[in-house]
Amino acid sequence: IDYTFVSQVNNNLISNAIRYATSKVNITYTSNNDGFYLSVSDNGCGFSKNILSKATNPYFTEEENHSEHFGLGLYICKILCEHHGGYLKIKNCSIGAKVTAFFKSLD
């Protein structure tokens, strides 16, 4: 597993969760024979239904101020996961959202 990729995705997902959380962020790391899972969830407002499918598109952001956030974070996370044979999964929870990154083992 390329830990540079994992670190980049980790930092981005945590940064996003902190930005949108009301007060709580959960981070879970799991590994098995298939690979490595990184899940980050928050208790923010989650993704609206029409946004959920667009969240990993390049340059997509809900924020009106594009000077700080260019809408590339989740897109880059998705590309890094896919480059490593994995995926990025985004879902809404009863409160907030959860993003799971999977990196396939290269063994």
How would you describe each model-predicted region?
Residues 73-77:
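Short alpha-helical Gxxx[C/S/T] motif in the catalytic ATP-binding
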Residues 23, 85-86:
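Conserved glycine-rich
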Residues 42:
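Acidic ATP/Mg2+-coordinating residue in the GHKL
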Residues 47-60:
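Short conserved segment of the HATPase_c
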Residues 80-81:
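Detector for a conserved hydrophobic position within an alpha-helical segment of the HATPase_c
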Residues 1:
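Conserved micro-motifs of the catalytic ATP-binding
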Residues 24-34:
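Short beta-strand/loop element within the Bergerat-fold HATPase_c
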Residues 11-12, 16:
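Conserved polar catalytic motif of the HATPase_c/GHKL fold
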